[in-house]
C-alpha cells in the first residue's frame, strides 16, 4: 500500500530534491549576517523548504533564519522529525559539478543526496502524502530544519532555547533499521603555545602546513611549504620513495625557491577515521625525517608521538571500549602551521557511555604541556541512549521490517545526529545495509530505489505513530 502511494509522487520528489541539491548550502562565516547567521547558502536552503511547504499548504515557523519548522497534524503530543539542509564542502575529484544534480536512470548524484537533503525530502513527502490522504491526525508533527548540523549545531541550540520540545522524534540522518544510541562527541584544538629559538641554522624551515577543512572529516589533501637550504633533489627523491612505500599519491614542485610537497589521502566521515587515509598526518610523518627548525620539529614530533596511526586514541592514552557503543575514536580533521604563529591540530573525539571524558582530558592536557601544547576544548555533547525495546523504537523498526523483511536489530553508532537534541530521539534511516556510503566524499549519490523506499518507510512509521492510536 505505502509503496504504491509513493509511486504517485516520484517525479515530484525528484524535482523538489533537485532544487534543494542545487543550493550550495555550505557554512560560510565570511558572509554571515543577521539575516544569514551561517552564511547565505544555508539560509537559502532553509527558505527553499519553507517555499515548498507553503506551496503544499503547510504552516511554517522561522527561528532567526538559522532553523525553523514545518507543521502538520493535531493533538497534544508532538513528533519531531529533525533534518538539516547544510552540507559539508564538496572537496575535489568529482566527476560532475556537486551542486548541479545529475539524474541518471537509477540515481541522483550531488553533494547532500545522502547527508541530509535526500532523507529530508523523503521525510517531507511522507508527511505530505498523509496530509493529501486527509488522515485523522492524533499527534502534531514538527519537521524541524537546521542549517548548521555539519559544524557547531548553532541551529538546534537556538531552536530549543525558545521552541517546544517534541514528545519523541527521529532524525533521518543515519541508517535503518534504527540508531538508538550515539557516542559522545567533542571537538578540541591542540595549540602549540611555546616557540623556541633556533640555536643552530636548520637545514630546512617549515614555512606553512595546511590540511583539512572540517573536524568531522578525514583530510584528503595536505600541503607543506618548506625552505630547503641544500640538497633539494635528495629531499624530493626521499619524498617520492616515501609516497611509494606508503602507497600514497602526492607531488613535489618548486615555487619561488620554496619546495611545495602535497599528499592525497582518502576523506571519510570522522566517526571512523580508521577507514580513511589522513593526508596531513602522513605528510607530517615524512617531514619528521628532515632536520627542521625547532618549532616545526616540535610540531611534527607531537603529531607522530600522539596522533599518527592512532585512530582509537591509543597514543593519547584514551583507548576505551564498550560492547554496546564501541570504541573511543579520534579524528585529526584540521592541521595548520606557519612559521610565525606555530601550529594547531583540530580534533573530533567520540566516546561511548562509561568513558571518563573530563578525567581523560585533564590528564592529557597536563601531559602535553611539557611539549609546548595546550588543549582548547570546544562544545561537548554527552552520549545519547534510548532503550531499543521502547515502544516508540519498536514502532519504527516494525515499519522498516514490514517493508523490507529485514530483521536486523537496532544498534548504536559513533556518529552524531540531531536525535540527541531530544529527550526521546533516535536516528531512523535513510541508509540501507546495501547503500554505498559516500557521505562527506566525492560523487555522493542516492539511488532512486533508496529514496523512494525510505519515503515509503517514513510514511508507514509516521502513520503508525501519529494516526493510529
Curated annotation (Swiss-Prot):
Gene Ontology BP term (one): proteolysis
Active-site residues annotated for this sequence: 86, 149
Keyword Transcription part of the UniProt annotation: no
Co-factor(s): Zn(2+)
GO molecular function, one term: zinc ion binding
Domain of life from the UniProt record: Bacteria
Keywords linked to the UniProt accession: Dipeptidase, Hydrolase, Metal-binding, Metalloprotease, Protease, Zinc
Gene3D superfamilies for the chain: 3.30.70.360, Zn peptidases
Enzyme class: hydrolase
The EC number(s) this enzyme carries: 3.4.13.-
Family matches, as SUPFAM superfamilies: Bacterial exopeptidase dimerisation domain, Zn-dependent exopeptidases
Binding site for Zn(2+) 1: 115, 150, 440
A Pfam family: Peptidase_M20
Binding-site list for Zn(2+) 2: 84, 115, 173
Co-factor remark: Binds 2 Zn(2+) ions per subunit.
Family stated for the protein in its record: Belongs to the peptidase M20A family.
PANTHER family in the cross-refs: ACETYLORNITHINE DEACETYLASE, N-ACETYL-L-CITRULLINE DEACETYLASE
NCBIfam families the record matches: dipeptidaselike (TIGR01887), PRK07318.1 (NF005591)
Protein name as annotated: Putative dipeptidase SAR1836
Organism annotation: Staphylococcus aureus (strain MRSA252)
Amino acid at each position: 500500500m505505502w509503496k504504491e502511494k509513493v509511486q504517485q509522487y516520484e517525479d515530484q520528489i525528484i524535482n523538489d530534491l533537485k532544487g534543494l541539491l542545487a543550493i550550495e548550502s555550505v557554512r560560510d562565516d565570511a558572509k554571515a549576517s543577521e539575516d544569514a547567521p551561517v552564511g547565505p547558502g544555508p539560509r537559502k536552503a532553509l527558505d527553499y523548504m519553507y517555499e515548498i511547504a507553503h506551496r503544499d499548504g503547510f504552516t511554517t515557523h522561522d527561528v532567526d533564519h538559522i532553523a525553523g519548522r514545518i507543521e502538520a497534524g493535531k493533538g497534544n503530543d508532538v513528533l519531531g522529525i529533525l533534518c538539516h539542509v547544510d552540507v559539508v564542502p564538496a572537496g575535489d575529484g568529482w566527476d560532475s559539478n556537486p551542486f548541479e544534480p545529475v539524474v541518471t536512470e537509477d540515481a541522483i548524484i550531488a553533494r547532500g543526496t545522502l547527508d541530509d537533503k535526500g532523507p529530508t525530502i523523503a521525510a517531507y513527502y511522507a508527511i505530505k502524502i498523509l496530509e493529501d490522504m486527509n488522515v485523522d491526525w492524533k499527534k502534531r508533527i514538527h519537521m524541524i530544519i537546521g542549517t548548521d548540523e555539519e559544524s557547531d549545531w548553532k541551529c538546534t541550540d537556538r531552536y530549543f532555547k525558545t521552541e517546544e520540545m517534541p514528545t519523541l522524534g527521529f532524525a533521518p540522518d543515519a541508517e535503518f533499521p534504527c540508531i538508538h544510541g550515539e557516542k559522545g562527541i567533542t571537538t578540541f584544538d591542540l595549540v602549540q603555545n611555546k616557540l623556541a629559538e633556533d640555536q643552530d641554522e636548520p637545514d630546512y624551515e617549515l614555512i606553512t602546513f595546511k590540511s583539512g577543512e572540517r573536524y568531522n572529516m578525514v583530510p584528503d589533501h595536505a600541503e607543506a611549504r618548506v625552505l630547503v637550504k641544500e640538497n633539494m633533489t635528495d629531499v624530493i627523491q626521499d619524498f617520492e620513495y616515501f609516497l611509494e612505500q606508503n602507497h600514497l599519491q602526492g607531488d613535489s614542485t618548486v615555487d619561488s625557491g620554496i619546495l611545495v610537497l602535497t599528499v592525497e589521502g582518502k576523506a571519510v566521515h570522522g566517526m571512523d577515521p580508521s577507514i580513511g587515509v589522513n593526508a596531513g598526518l602522513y605528510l607530517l610523518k615524512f617531514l619528521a625525517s628532515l632536520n627542521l627548525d625547532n618549532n616545526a620539529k616540535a610540531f611534527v614530533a607531537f603529531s607522530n608521538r600522539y596522533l599518527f596511526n592512532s585512530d582509537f586514541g591509543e597514543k593519547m592514552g584514551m583507548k576505551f571500549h564498550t560492547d554496546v557503543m564501541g570504541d573511543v575514536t579520534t579524528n585529526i580533521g584540521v592541521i595548520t602551521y606557519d612559521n610565525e604563529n606555530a601550529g594547531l591540530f583540530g580534533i573530533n573525539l567520540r566516546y561511548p557511555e562509561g568513558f571518563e571524558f573530563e578525567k581523560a582530558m585533564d590528564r592529557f592536557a597536563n601531559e602535553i604541556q611539557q611539549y609546548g601544547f595546550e588543549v582548547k576544548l570546544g562544545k561537548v555533547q554527552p552520549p545519547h541512549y534510548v532503550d531499543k525495546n521502547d515502544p516508540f523504537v519498536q514502532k519504527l523498526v516494525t515499519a522498516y521490517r514490514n517493508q523490507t523483511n529485514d530483521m536486523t536489530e537496532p544498534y548504536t553508532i559513533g556518529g552524531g545526529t540531531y536525535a540527541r537534541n531530544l529527550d526521546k530521539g533516535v536516528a531512523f534511516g535513510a541508509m540501507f545495509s546495501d547503500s554505498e556510503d559516500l557521505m562527506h566524499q566525492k560523487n555522493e549519490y542516492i539511488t532512486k530505489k533508496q529514496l523512494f523506499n525510505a519515503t515509503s518507510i517514513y510514511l508507514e512509521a509516521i502513520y503508525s505513530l501519529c494516526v493510529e492510536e
